[in-house]
Amino acid sequence: MGLFGMMKFAHTHHLVKRQGLGAPAGYFTPIAVDLWNVMYTLVVKYQRRYPSYDREAITLHCLCRLLKVFTQKSLFPIFVTDRGVNCMEPVVFGAKAILARTTAQCRTDEEASDVDASPPPSPITDSRPSSAFSNMRRRGTSLASGTRGTAGSGAALPSAAPSKPALRLAHLFCIRVLRALGYAYINSGQLEADDACANLYHTNTVAYVYTTDTDLLLMGCDIVLDISACYIPTINCRDILKYFKMSYPQFLALFVRCHTDLHPNNTYASVEDVLRECHWTPPSRSQTRRAIRREHTSSRSTETRPPLPPAAGGTEMRVSWTEILTQQIAGGYEDDEDLPLDPRDVTGGHPGPRSSSSEILTPPELVQVPNAQLLEEHRSYVASRRRHVIHDAPESLDWLPDPMTITELVEHRYIKYVISLIGPKERGPWTLLKRLPIYQDIRDENLARSIVTRHITAPDIADRFLEQLRTQAPPPAFYKDVLAKFWDE
């Protein structure tokens, strides 16, 4: 799942930053957890180590380890799952559903050119399909139809999913234990977990999304890859945009071709393929060295960002991405050495002074950071998140030709669906984005004990896990108090 080749690209080009994610004393950092994505990784790892454990035992073992780390690092998880809290809801929204519905609706590319490109509205869209995307029409065509790469020229019917190793993951048991322990969760219902996580991120509910699924980057989110590491590996969407030197609408329009769930039978393009077609070149070594110096310099004075070249007036046609890259390679644009960076982008953690507490200098247990500095970094981070709301996502459609094939129709529909999830709506003087409801049941340790002992019949194993839950997973705070303190104080 995700963007094909993005994880490898991010590691190769040093876009995976390692952060401490240290919050000020008394604060918890809210984080959305793509539960099945995270649990799958853990179960695959530990079921080999404990071959005698059944599904419930290995699931609870992984869950105990996960909750322990959340507590140690002062992270407040909001758990998100596919198929609702009962694991029975059909998924009717998202990438897979758009592909299935489109391929059932259109059997040939000729039919696709006559079909409405609007997908069904998401659960957070309060408009009907006929009007939900009326403000997302293209103002011009910047890429000629038929200039796409060879990958994805047509869509074949979805094939059977590749076989996976037998997975001892008890989904419903896992959710019931979390609810009994009083953790916050999202009843995503008919949404994919990715889409619900993106909604939580863009409504400034969570600071990060814990997942290894890189399609969250396509939806403009910052993702955490592994919370068990001393310094947590993260990928920030804005770091990728700066590295590519492109806007978010360009990023969404270009790399939708890499989304594996939208392109069956290996018809997706890789990240490297897309960049190669755009004639993109990575920053030179001198640029990289200058960027490293910027990261470790705390005394540098902030300079004024020079204005970008004005767009030609009297036209609604957007400049092509290839033209921008050509000018960049030829030296048509100034190097960004003198452009001030967002402190968050150079420190890899909450913004603040360049000598951030999140830089990798010494092991975290040896780092003593004044709480006043942590508080200053936290406030800068919150202000930065509020400034960088994505308002221009609908411009992604300006970079695409009219859909003439099934693949292009699927991509159009998916982009419009993403816009409906993350793009704020204008309501008079207000800009609003509806958040999915968060639920948090009252903690009931007796219920948790009953669930565990009912499914794990070996008394010694059940008692050991219950003791771990009691000591390592204390009662979580009420989610409204956590969010109010993190975002509003």
Curated annotation (Swiss-Prot):
Annotated consequence of substituting D215N: No effect on human eIF4H binding
EC number per UniProt: 3.1.27.-
Effect of R435H: Complete loss of human eIF4H binding
Keywords linked to the UniProt accession: Decay of host mRNAs by virus, Endonuclease, Eukaryotic host gene expression shutoff by virus, Host gene expression shutoff by virus, Host mRNA suppression by virus, Host-virus interaction, Hydrolase, Inhibition of host innate immune response by virus, Interferon antiviral system evasion, Late protein, Nuclease, RNA-binding, Viral immunoevasion, Virion
InterPro entries: PIN-like_dom_sf, XPG-I_dom
Outcome following mutation: D195N: No effect on human eIF4H binding
GO biological process entries: symbiont-mediated degradation of host mRNA; symbiont-mediated suppression of host gene expression; symbiont-mediated suppression of host innate immune response
Effect of E192Q: No effect on human eIF4H binding
Effect listed in the UniProt record for changing T211A: Complete loss of human eIF4H binding
Region Disordered, residue ranges: 110-135, 142-161, 285-316, 333-363
Primary enzyme class: hydrolase
Pfam families from the UniProt entry: XPG_I
Compositional bias per record (Polar residues), positions renumbered to this chain: 124-134
Presence of the UniProt keyword RNA-binding in the record: yes
Localization terms from the record: Virion
Assembly and interaction partners: Interacts with human EIF4H, EIF4A1 and EIF4A2; interaction with eIF4AI and EIF4A2 presumably allows Vhs protein to associate with the eIF4F cap-binding complex.
Family per record: Belongs to the herpesviridae VHS protein family.
Its biological purpose: Minor structural protein that acts as an endoribonuclease during lytic infection. Degrades host mRNAs in the cytoplasm by cutting them at preferred sites, including some in regions of translation initiation. Together with inhibition of host splicing by ICP27, contributes to an overall decrease in host protein synthesis. Also, after the onset of viral transcription, accelerates the turnover of viral mRNA, thereby facilitating the sequential expression of different classes of viral genes.
Protein name: Virion host shutoff protein
Source organism per UniProt: Human herpesvirus 1 (strain KOS)
Record gene name: UL41
